Curated annotation (Swiss-Prot):
GO terms for molecular function: tryptophan synthase activity. Keywords: Amino-acid biosynthesis, Aromatic amino acid biosynthesis, Lyase, Tryptophan biosynthesis. It holds the Pfam family Trp_syntA. NCBIfam families: trpA (TIGR00262). GO terms for cellular component: cytosol. InterPro entries: Aldolase_TIM (IPR013785), RibuloseP-bd_barrel (IPR011060), Trp_synthase_alpha_AS (IPR018204), Trp_synthase_suA (IPR002028). This is Tryptophan synthase alpha chain. It comes from Bacillus cereus (strain ATCC 14579 / DSM 31 / CCUG 7414 / JCM 2152 / NBRC 15305 / NCIMB 9373 / NCTC 2599 / NRRL B-3711). The lineage of its organism: Bacteria, Bacillati, Bacillota, Bacilli, Bacillales.
């Protein structure tokens, strides 16, 4: 469980496809069913979003999914229970994407206990600055759950080194300045940014934010170790276009042979 399980997703040159699903969008049974589908389809890791009323890093698609989940009365406790149930059936690592407020409102210790029971392997907290990560990092380290760092295009290399020096799991490299969402293409400087991050950190580097097509996936995994696909996966699940998710997974895995 935990850090080692995430590490295994990248071993021997594997390229990781990491889909994002919003916890409770469509109900908790739907969450479990979607995780089972993604596991069977060959996803490497699944990222589960915790719905929050003020999601500052999320684009419109993920915001709408979070609102649907909150409007349906889904709770953090309910999401943990659903994950604990589906964990018995799937092997891929679970990574939670949560803002800090739900963690503090739930109680840090209680949150981590529930993570353990649900088989959570890593956590991303997009609004937790590096300078404040001791709020939760030592508690996670004690139980072998990875606190996964986010680095951005605007981060100086010294800061990237600092942020990632004590991190575990993988580095989430944000490929755009702004919120999540589908984009048409990536600028040339994104390539040099990802190459720079790769050359300065000792963890796998995963690109995320704005990745939505097979071409995007192929472009990104040529440079880094995997991709997170969020808004597009939510859209495809909502519209029952699951074969297109399988195509994105296939595009990722194809690059392992290269």
């Amino acid at each position: 469980m935990g850090v080692e399980k995430i590490k295994a997703a990248f071993e021997n040159g594997k390229k990781a496809f990491i889909p994002y699903v919003m916890g409770g969008d469509g109900g908790l049974e739907k969450l479990k069913e979607r995780i089972r589908f993604l596991d069977e389809a060959g996803a490497s890791i699944v990222e589960i979003g915790i719905p929050f009323s003020d999601p500052v890093a999320d684009g419109p698609t993920i915001q709408r999914a979070g609102k649907r989940a909150l409007d349906s009365g889904v709770t953090l406790k309910g999401i943990f229970q659903a994950l604990a149930e589906v964990r018995k059936e799937v092997q891929m690592p679970f990574v939670l994407m949560t803002y800090l407020n739900p963690v503090l409102a739930f109680g840090k210790e209680r949150f981590i206990e529930n993570c353990i029971e649900a088989g959570v392997d890593g956590i991303i907290v997009p609004d937790l600055p590096y300078e404040e990560q001791n709020i939760i990092a030592p508690l996670l380290r004690e139980v072998n759950i990875a606190l996964i760092p986010l680095v951005t295009v605007t981060s100086p290399i010294e800061r990237i080194e600092k942020i990632t020096s004590e991190s575990e799991g993988f580095v989430y490299a944000v490929t755009v300045a702004g919120v999540t969402g589908v984009r048409q293409n990536f600028k040339e400087e994104i390539h040099s940014y990802l190459e720079k991050v790769k050359s300065h950190v000792n963890l796998p580097v995963v690109a995320g934010f704005g990745i939505s097509t097979k071409e995007h996936v192929e472009e990104m995994v040529t440079i880094c170790d995997g991709v997170v696909v969020g808004s597009k996966v939510i859209e495809l699940l909502e519209n029952e276009k699951r074969e297109e998710i399988c195509e994105l997974i296939y595009a990722t895995k194809q690059k392992e042979e290269a």
